[in-house]
Amino acid sequence: MSEVYLLIYTFKFLQFLTLEHTEIRVHERDIAYGRHGITVSPSEDREDMILKTIIFCGTTEVTDLDLTQYLMHIHVFFTKKNYQLFTNNCRKFSTIVLRYLDTDDNEEGNKIYA
């Protein structure tokens, strides 16, 4: 079992607009989707973003291997080319990954972007 967190960062867009970016932390890795496609990295602070909120979404029984295979399956929808800041973005990706992880208590995380 692994704990699942929704991370919400803020960042400057066009130097005058502040936007939010979401990531999922599970199996001690941060999984995100952005203008570079899907990224998976060790859990750490982001240099270009400020961590605003961490929401505990529950625990999952999905293994690291199963999650990796799932990400390989959905990567065709979340490529660098398919990224759209306001439609096909980190929030949509985070919601889909949270649903796949089927956490035992992910209702609060789903409320944010459902």
State each model region's role.
Residues 1-91, 98-112:
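Non-catalytic ligand/cofactor/substrate-binding and regulatory segments of enzyme domains
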